Amino acid sequence: MGLPLARLVAVCLVLALAKGLELQKEARSRNHVCSTWGDFHYKTFDGDVFRFPGLCDYNFASDCRDSYKEFAVHLKRGLDKAGGHSSIESVLITIKDDTIYLTHKLAVVNGAMVSTPHYSSGLLIEKNDAYTKVYSRAGLSLMWNREDALMVELDGRFQNHTCGLCGDFNGMQANNEFLSDGIRFSAIEFGNMQKINKPEVVCEDPEEVQEPESCSEHRAECERLLTSTAFEDCQARVPVELYVLACMHDRCQCPQGGACECSTLAEFSRQCSHAGGRPENWRTASLCPKKCPGNMVYLESGSPWLDTCSHLEVSSLCEEHYMDGCFCPEGTVYDDITGSGCIPVSQCHCKLHGHLYMPGQEITNDCEQCVCNAGRWMCKDLPCPETCALEGGSHITTFDGKKFTFHGDCYYVLTKTKYNDSYALLGELASCGSTDKQTCLKTVVLLTDNKKNVVAFKSGGSVLLNEMEVSLPHVAASFSIFKPSSYHIVVNTMFGLRLQIQLVPVMQLFVTLDQSAQGQVQGLCGNFNGLESDDFMTSGGMVEATGAGFANTWKAQSSCHDKLDWLDDPCPLNIESANYAEHWCSLLKRSETPFARCHLAVDPTEYYKRCKYDTCNCQNNEDCMCAALSSYARACAAKGVMLWGWRESVCNKDVHACPSSQIFMYNLTTCQQTCRSISEGDTHCLKGFAPVEGCGCPDHTFMDEKGRCVPLSKCSCYHHGLYLEAGDVILRQEERCICRNGRLQCTQVKLIGHTCLSPQILVDCNNLTALAIREPRPTSCQTLVARYYHTECISGCVCPDGLLDNGRGGCVVEDECPCIHNKQFYDSGKSIKLDCNNTCTCQKGRWECTRYACHSTCSIYGSGHYITFDGKHYDFDGHCSYVAVQDYCGQNSTGSFSIITENVPCGTTGVTCSKAIKIFIGGTELKLVDKHRVVKQLEEGHHVPFITREVGLYLVVEVSSGIIVIWDKKTTIFIKLDPSYKGNVCGLCGNFDDQTKNDFTTRDHMVVASELDFGNSWKEASTCPDVSHNPDPCSLNPHRRSWAEKQCSIIKSDVFLACHGKVDPTVFYDACVHDSCSCDTGGDCECFCSAVASYAQECTKAEACVFWRTPDLCPVFCDYYNPPDECEWHYEPCGNRSFETCRTLNGIHSNISVSYLEGCYPRCPEDRPIYDEDLKKCVSGDKCGCYIEDTRYPPGGSVPTDEICMSCTCTNTSEIICRPDEGKIINQTQDGIFCYWETCGSNGTVEKHFEICVSSTLSPTSMTSFTTTSTPISTTPISTTITTTSATATTTVPCCFWSDWINNNHPTSGNGGDRENFEHVCSAPENIECRAATDPKLDWTELGQKVQCNVSEGLICNNEDQYGTGQFELCYDYEIRVNCCFPMEYCLSTVSPTTSTPISSTPQPTSSPTTLPTTSPLTSSATSPTTSHITSTVSPTTSPTTSTTSPTTSPTTSTTSPTTSTTSPTPSPTTSTTSPTPSPTTSTTSPTPSPTTSTTSPTTSPITSPTTSTTSP
């Protein structure tokens, strides 16, 4: 049994070797790196190393495709003044339209010198102490040490498309670079061909020089350095011999005393780090020392992203290769705030608005008290009142910060107590211009003391208490009223309500409530519960989608008509008003105006938009403009920032119009001084309210009781505080009133003589002597909660006592009152479904809803538009990569995920779009870019399962931990989080705590007002420059505005009418115009279509399906997927919820449905009812296969398992069946003279065996012999002798290489197909393999298509040949690889050959695969080598094995005599002896420790050749 066992062990060792070489080859091909270093050494993408001492300008690496060239890298080397060491003088990089010129000190982009870091369109240039780096989204990264070393890494899509000193990147060493069409080039000849000839520049080519005869004296030292313990992790990753030879050459050429080996050692370290290794510090004080600034230390391998005081967690998210350089000592971070070097985290300062704060320093900011702790603010909330504002007659901001615009025409409940009628605040909105779209706040009504007292504040400045005018100040038991300036009235109450009423230039209201009222109020000002998301809570208890739908439910008079949302922008309707508005309103944003002092405290963006809106919409432009500017000044004063002098250049007519003896002041904080206050003493005067501006009495002066701050204009008519001149017209409900002879004469606009529908009755106020309803009582279902506020008789149809108006023209009892949601009526008892699993039921006009927690969504779309998880809309045009959301927040430094958005400019205006998304989950990185996903395994982190699938136009990534990312493959990303993440995330998407007011929480935990401060704090790398402003692309491209507004008007048009009541279109329309103006360098239609699609998607989620695409407007071509004469694929604007997929059949269900996504969906026929998302076709159930996480295994295919003695297979019922793999050998070891091995038993158990090791002696043959030992794999090098002999003379044996897989073409439709050839790889391959590109496990023969795969033409698949072969009758996507063979004399390495000095017997990693012979069954067979799988059938036999192989050593022509080889189980040097007499080879191996004697030639390059095995009976 000994001999068969020895053979078995030998075969297993060969298989292990072959597998290892295969993996190394694959690992190398993934690196895609070319480099140059030291004394003119170059390494190509394919792994060739050569020396070329050229000093001209050379093409280092370029895209050499004929159709379109994306990049080129040129370099120029020079010698130092002593003429010894060479260095790179300059690097010239061209990437698409950008040209970058680098020298030791400068970086020049497109002719302009730039500072680093430099960011532009898809380009980053940065410097550190050791390197200059260039990154491009085109798929290129470059690293230069500003001395002698340059490294370029390319994306895999450039394979077989490059030229230059870096070679053609085809995966074949030497081929096409040093060997082309049978002609061999030297390194000098190859290098000279890459010369860049410049006009008027003469540069001599280097000539061939005689290499030194021997550098072997340096081998031992170079091997010692490169195999030291510092490089222990590198030995299996990088071919050491290549760098040993380079090191030997460097030392040979080195002047006396020079440290010339440093460059090669450093390059070896860089290549090791790039391959995933971790070289340790090999430098010493005497060997290539390096110095670092400050207290930094030099490390050979560290994360290129330094943790800093402002970015504490970035190193854990770094996706780049480790590198050498200066780093902070362990336990410290770099202080990028004060620049004090490396410090402990506890000593990090904090930064706020440009000011530095020491650790432990406290500040009080608005409603927070914060302390600086380790570079982060630790804050706690303070009891803080909140303010609701009604500005400009239509703009409302709730207590919780929600902003909306509503043009009303009625009395509305602004705020009232939720559980009783102790107080209520009403506001009268009415038309004040020529149209009903210009509305003003006319009256504010305070009902207090359980509505026993009614206080009305008129826009003219008068105050009425229970319809009797009172003079100010006025003090009552529960409230007091004062007039601190000519512009303002202030009201203070005993129940925590404070009012600030602005009178000039238009009436505006600011309502403040103490924290004690939180959650106790309702009305247009919201419910004051800290959650902006439910501020549109109607009087019926349901959250509405739009402002008008919400406000209409809070009418205080049932006779008022519902108002619609006005979606038009008033500015385009009047160009003169628009220009006027832009000129003056832009003062709010300019940095040189007084308003700039407040930008950090109050973001001017929203005020600027309101200012333009009101100025364009107002009949008196200046008054509305000044009101808007004063609103911003008031907001600043409330934050403690006084805008002194802002009226000096604008809105100054009132400053100089103060009545005699009064002066204008910006910070009035006390009551007016009146003659009455002298006689009575205003001890009750309110003090300490927010500063107001206006005319007031100077110190030591008083106002008499007849004085007026605001002069009254001469009025012919007076009506409810409004003075009307003769001929003026006012619209009042359904009446048109004209001022004539000092009286209002009113005419019904709608005839009231019509018949009311029963049971309503007609009320004609002209036929009543009096109708006064002083006690509020409900008259409609909508005013049940708001209650009724009646000021005058209104003619029309009303319900009789005991019945309520149901809003649909009928009268019902209270129990039958319907409910309203999104402007639709629902009868009492009806239920509707909301969001995830919540339902609402209508009961007596109010909604009763369940409150289950749901997923929340963050949206990033277009050019920098964001909607946070809590619903906050904002814009941020950053130019770098930013944290969208992560759970590395607060003190949590061990988060589980991070999602990064990469922004690049999408035009010349400075606007950016999200072009790529990086998802870090556990130990995996997913990158969504260029319409596909790339998966990369990180070196740290645990495995987190995830699945990806295409749904319609979108790619969906679902992580098992409750994260869903939906990407439209362009610029739109939706991120959904499970409720378990609530309050535990941070980033540009906010903190997911249902409160929008703290969504702008920076990385250092401070809540800021500016979207710029917020966005800048979440940049991924601290080197990214801050954004100083958000550009307005329509102002920069005014010629595009009209086109953008015309195209985007579809969002406000009737096309989306069904959605307007469910999703507010205004913000999406603004975003659409913004994006359509910004995309001015191509893709403008794509920007527009993406913007409209974003609104359409929100409509679909709100169950408002809109068919908006047409053949002329953003069409989607689904028929592309249909085979000829079939119509299976269709466009679905709102997704498809009806079909089953193979994934659902396998039990893979999404945690949340995404079937609402628009796109192309199949309608599967009955015989193929299931959709296979991976194959993208309809199949029957038995064709689905099996799924493990995101990987599909076809029916009948093998399924991997962790059980080493089990083999698993996928059945046609999508089940995975596992069976014991009986007899499988799984492990072999040797301990002294004993050999141990393990096999699989019949029931899947592991059976152990051992015996005394017996060596094998293979009889000589007439062809070749193969001898191996059974030495332990893990501890002893494997000694293998492969010798070719001949009875007469030696023959030349070819050497062969398998190419990388080639997939240059992809299937086309129509009369096309798929073709792959081996052009530029080799002219006459020996063999070819073809397989499916999308599923490499499938051979081309398994796909059932009519395909040619041969060495004559490559692969040819024609669509016309596929009739009857499948549903689509289209070719699949294939890839090929070929086996290229060359005469032995051309297979020399491009490294200078070594001498016959003995080398270590430890097997060195090779740079291309080697195929060794296998033992075959008792038959004759010819086997072609592969690098992916080696299958061997082993049969016990005592017959000798005859095989023809090629040597793994360098080519020799010799006659070999019998050789005795003795191998010990311990590493020992090898002694080579060659005799010139021909005879067979006899090899004897024993397990005794002794030197090894073998016949071998010096190794110069790895060789693979075909193996033919013949076994005699």
From Swiss-Prot:
Glycans are attached at residues 160, 420, 667, 767, 837, 892, 1136, 1151, 1212, 1227, 1243, 1264, 1267-1268, 1280, 1286, 1290, 1350. Its main location: secreted. O-glycosylated. O-glycosylation is required for mucin assembly. Goblet cells synthesize two forms of mucin that differ in branched chain O-glycosylation and the site of production in the colon. Ca(2+) 3 binds at residues 870, 991, 993, 998-999. Cu(+) binds at residues 143, 151, 323. Residues 32-204, 386-561, 856-1025 form the VWFD domain. SUPFAM superfamilies: FnI-like domain (SSF57603), Serine protease inhibitors (SSF57567). Disulfide bonds join 34-166, 56-203, 64-163, 215-252, 222-247, 234-272, 254-260, 262-288, 292-326, 309-348, 328-342, 350-372, 367-384, 370-379, 388-525, 410-560, 432-440, 571-616, 585-611, 598-636, 618-624, 626-651, 658-695, 671-685, 675-715, 697-709, 717-739, 737-746, 781-817, 799-811, 819-842, 836-854, 840-849, 858-989, 880-1024, 889-986, 906-913, 1034-1077, 1048-1072, 1059-1099, 1079-1087, 1089-1114, 1105-1134, 1118-1160, 1142-1184, 1164-1178, 1186-1210, 1205-1235, 1208-1218. GO terms for cellular component: extracellular matrix; extracellular space; inner mucus layer; mucus layer; outer mucus layer. Residues 350-410 form the VWFC domain. Residues 1-20 form the signal peptide. InterPro entries: Mucin_vWF_Thrombospondin_sf, Ser_inhib-like_sf, TIL_dom, VWF/SSPO/ZAN-like_Cys-rich_dom, VWF_dom, VWF_type-D, WxxW_domain. Keywords: Autocatalytic cleavage, Calcium, Copper, Disulfide bond, Glycoprotein, Metal-binding, Repeat, Secreted, Signal. Ca(2+) 4 binds at residues 1306, 1309, 1313. Homomultimer; disulfide-linked. The N- and C-terminus mediate their assembly into higher order structures to form filaments. The CTCK domains of two polypeptides associate in the endoplasmic reticulum to generate intermolecularly disulfide-bonded dimers. These dimers progress to the Golgi apparatus, which is a more acidic environment than the endoplasmic reticulum. Under acidic conditions, the N-termini form non-covalent intermolecular interactions that juxtapose assemblies of the third VWD domain (VWD3) from different CTCK-linked dimers. This is Mucin-2. It comes from Rattus norvegicus.
